[in-house]
From Swiss-Prot:
InterPro entries tied to this protein: PHBA_efflux_AaeB/fusaric-R (IPR006726), PHBA_efflux_pump_AaeB (IPR023706)
Domain of life: Bacteria
Broad class of the protein's primary localization: membrane
Keyword Membrane: yes
Protein name: p-hydroxybenzoic acid efflux pump subunit AaeB
Single Gene Ontology MF annotation: transmembrane transporter activity
């Protein structure tokens, strides 16, 4: 059998088993709505598969399941608090629920992307509980407990199905990606030392940026897979920092070569020009480079020496990750040498727009439902909250909303066939019911791995509109209300995204660039504790977001890279201890923070001019302290860079 077909069939079987097992156990334990367990199993297993375009890693499935449990608990708690405080005022209760959904979406847009699902789920879980139980508020505590139980059952069934069908470990992919990343780092160094075209260097750098980010995502999946991988997980965090450092130092070498300050010649240049295509060749090449560097260290540029040192640390950590052995004393010193600085979100305005979309959409929908008494209103409201909560953090919310809409349109005829022909023919047989649902899930599971538009939405929507409750009833009007309500909810969500436009792209890009300016100035310090802080992961995270926002804007990309390189250069400077210089550092950091957080262009320009003035004064203080020429030159280079790009950073 074709190697690409077998994993798809395996995942389709895994998905079918998870959905059928959760449904059967839900009926076996006499739960009131077993479809919630089946729906949870489908979403937790199929969501990562749709993103990956194939059989997802076990850690990704478990991570998704854990996030769903946490989000459900938070949402149930929020629903109970809202009910207890406003049970005598139904309209106020629904408005508070809409406000809760908007706040949760706002928070989900500020946290890390991999954790945003928790708060998005918490928002619409409270909406589901309150809207579904609005007619009988006294039953809401029992309703919340049942929902939590059924969701936990669905997640347990997904994990069991994953274990039955050979869980896919991410470890081998991590090992291959780490070797490939080091090879790419060396090829970037070759381009920066040689005379490669600027576009070629940018393309290589961009590829390394995405590879390093991908390994960061694998790191989280590896820990969720098993606690056995914790030593490798710890090493990977520092290994990523070494990767950022090697990229930065290679870029600094390229800038120095362009300015004529970095000349690599002789045997070292000949060695660097030799092509390297395999990890084995790379190891031999690096050994020879270190041997030459040890004998000619005084004549080599400092960034090249730093790059070789970082590559040695990278190889040591990579070997430990490969074997997952106990962390040695030398590795402990590397792990504890620096303190990574966490990046704060630069998408505050974007997050506010996302929360506003969800809050306004659900509030208007609730008022319309209450005024008209529309029979499909509750389902429409739930779908409106679900879509607006889940798609906002995605790179293209409009396309994701269209995917939901297409899925609900597919679910109408598919669900009608299942509801009116297939399910009644099972004659209340749990075995036949499981077989029918399993076959449907198997077919859709194959399409999900192809990332077919509407496939994931079709699976979730079809399971949701089928009356998989205990006891099962076949009410055609209720089925049509649910199906039509889902479609109208998706249409309204799509309309909300189109009407409430997000114009924060330019503002977020400017904020990211000014955060990079602040990071560059953070490299100036005389305090040992501050010098140990590693800002590179946070700075490259800002750069990655900037590339996603402006994929074709090479001017912003190169400015951001230049600021990161300047930060690394300033961080390596040996600035003498002085109260005057330390006070200058504090003032410049404070002013740079004001530039990044300024509300308007006028205020930002004023703070930026103040920052340039402070940097000129700082250069004068450096001259008075008779510091080394390289320190003065590095500060002058940063000042010139800011003056040259003042328009891009302020307007």
């Amino acid at each position: 059998m074709n190697s690409s077909v077998f994993p798809r069939l395996r995942f389709a079987c895994k998905l079918s088993l998870a959905v059928v097992l959760s449904l059967v156990l839900g009926f076996w334990f006499e739960m009131e709505t077993p479809r919630w367990a089946a729906l949870t199993a489908a979403i937790v297993a199929a969501g990562p598969a749709f993103v990956a375009g194939g059989d997802p890693f076990s850690g990704a499935i478990r991570h998704r399941g854990l996030l769903r449990i946490l989000g459900t608990f938070i949402g149930c708690f929020g629903a109970l608090v809202i009910i207890m405080t406003t049970v005598r005022a139904p309209v106020v209760m629904l408005m508070l629920c809409c406000l809760w959904a908007g706040v949760c979406v706002w928070i989900s847009s500020l946290v890390k992307t991999e954790n945003s699902y928790v708060f998005a789920l918490a928002g619409y879980t409270a909406l589901i509980i309150i809207i579904t139980s609005q007619s009988s508020p006294r039953a809401i505590p029992q309703f919340a407990i049942e929902r939590c139980s059924e969701i936990i059952l669905g997640i347990v069934c997904v994990i069991l199905a994953d274990l039955v069908f050979s869980p896919r470990s991410v470890k081998q992919d991590v090992d291959r990606a780490i070797d490939d990343l080091l090879l790419g780092q060396y090829q970037l160094l070759q381009r920066c030392v040689g005379r490669a075209a600027t576009d070629d260097v940018d393309s290589c750098w961009h590829g390394l940026l995405r590879k390093t980010q991908a390994i960061g995502g694998m790191r989280n999946i590896l820990l969720m897979e098993s606690s056995h991988w914790q030593p490798a997980w710890r090493r990977m965090k520092t290994l990523l920092s070494q990767s950022w450092m090697m990229m930065t130092l290679a870029g600094e070498i390229g800038l120095m070569r362009r300015d004529g300050d970095c000349v690599v010649k002789g045997g070292l240049l000949m060695l660097l020009e030799q092509p390297v295509t395999t990890p084995g060749d790379l190891r031999r090449q690096l050994r020879q480079l270190r041997h030459l560097a040890a004998s000619h260290s005084s004549r080599l540029p400092a960034p090249l020496v730093g790059w070789l040192a970082a590559s040695s640390r990278y190889q040591l950590l990579a070997a430990g990750i490969r074997t997952n052995a106990r962390i040695s004393q030398r590795e402990t010193e590397i792990l504890e040498a620096e303190t990574p600085v966490r990046a704060s979100s630069a998408e505050t305005h974007h997050a506010l727009i996302n929360g506003l979309r969800t809050g306004v959409a659900t509030a208007v929908g609730c008022l319309f439902w209450l005024l008209t008494g529309w029979t499909s209103g509750s389902v429409c409201m739930v779908m409106l909250g679900v879509v607006t909560a889940l798609v906002m953090r995605l790179p293209n919310p409009l396309m994701a909303a269209k995917d939901f809409l297409i899925g609900t349109l597919i679910a109408l005829p598919l669900g009608a066939v299942m509801f009116m022909l297939v399910l009644p023919a099972t004659q209340q047989s749990l075995l036949l019911l499981g077989l029918c649902i399993g076959v449907m899930t198997f077919v859709i599971g194959i399409e999900i791995q192809k990332r077919r538009l509407g496939s994931l939405g079709a699976l979730a929507s079809t399971i949701n509109i089928l009356v998989l409750d205990n006891p099962m009833t076949f009410n055609l009007s209720q089925f049509l209300d649910n199906a039509i309500g889902q479609i109208i909810g998706c249409v309204l969500a799509l309309a909300v995204i189109m009407l409430i436009r997000d114009n924060s792209r330019a503002r977020t890009g400017r904020t990211l660039l000014n955060r990079l300016v602040h990071g560059a100035i953070d490299g100036l310090s005389t305090r040992p504790a501050r010098c140990r802080e590693n800002h590179l992961p946070a700075l490259y995270q800002h750069l990655f977001l900037l590339i996603n926002l402006f994929p074709g804007d090479m001017a912003k990309y190169r400015l951001a890279l230049s600021l990161i390189i300047v930060h690394q250069r300033l961080r390596q400077l040996d600035i003498p201890l002085s109260d005057t210089l330390a006070e200058c550092h504090r003032q410049m950091r404070a002013t740079a923070a004001r530039v990044a957080g300024a509300a308007g262009d006028t205020q930002r320009s004023r703070y930026f001019s103040q920052l340039l003035t402070q940097m000129e004064e700082y250069r004068q203080h450096l001259g008075e302290h008779q510091v080394a020429d390289d320190i003065v030159a590095a500060v002058a280079r940063l000042t010139a860079l800011l003056q040259r790009h003042q328009h891009a950073l302020c307007d």
